């Protein structure tokens, strides 16, 4: 367990790092929520855990199991916009869309922010807008498979739903990695 006086900045420094391995965005955001709940969780895993969190359908199952919201559309921007409309000011949410997952929130002034946790040097809350959705999340206006338009899901979970879910601690155990078994992505560092 983390000391009760652990600050958000300390949590971001603890879980953030230059890990860009497949699926690490999805699990590091969950590790952040775990740390906010007081658990000492680091996310530098490999093997089956890495594969699990890189699959959209697994993220969809997590959203469904805890009572989050899914939106499907051929246009990622439209799906994201519908999800963003449901965000309450001051609350934090687990959000995935297109090729990325992150924590997201809306400030008192109505601005959306996302939590960068994969940078080797510059983690923290950043402005979230259409440009970020395109460049950081990889959002597209249309998805096709073999020439046919295809809908993809985007998901949103109130972090309090996750924190209160009976299976969340088990998920954190799956993410948490013993120091001698940690696998780092390019530019990752030991935490």
Task: Give residue ranges: language-model regions.
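Active-site-adjacent structural segments surrounding the nucleophilic cysteine of cysteine proteases
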Residues: 1-47
């Amino acid at each position: 367990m983390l000391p009760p006086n652990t600050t958000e900045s300390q949590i971001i420094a603890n879980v953030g790092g230059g890990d860009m391995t497949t699926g690490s965005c999805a699990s590091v955001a969950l590790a952040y929520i775990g740390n906010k709940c007081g658990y000492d969780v680091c996310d530098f895993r490999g093997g089956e855990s890495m594969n699990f969190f890189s699959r959209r359908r697994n993220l969809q199952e997590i959203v469904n199991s805890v009572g989050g919201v899914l939106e499907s559309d051929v246009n990622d921007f439209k799906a994201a916009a519908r999800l963003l409309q449901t965000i309450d000011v001051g609350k934090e949410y687990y959000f995935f869309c297109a090729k990325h997952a992150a924590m997201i929130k809306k400030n008192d002034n109505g601005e959306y922010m996302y939590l960068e946790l994969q940078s080797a040097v510059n983690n923290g809350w950043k402005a979230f807008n259409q440009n970020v959705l395109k460049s950081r999340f990889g959002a597209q206006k249309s998805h096709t498979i073999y020439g046919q338009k295809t809908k993809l899901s985007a998901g949103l979970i109130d972090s309090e739903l996750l924190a209160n879910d009976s299976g969340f601690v088990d998920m954190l155990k799956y993410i948490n990695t013993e120091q001698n078994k940690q696998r780092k992505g390019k530019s990752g560092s030991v935490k």
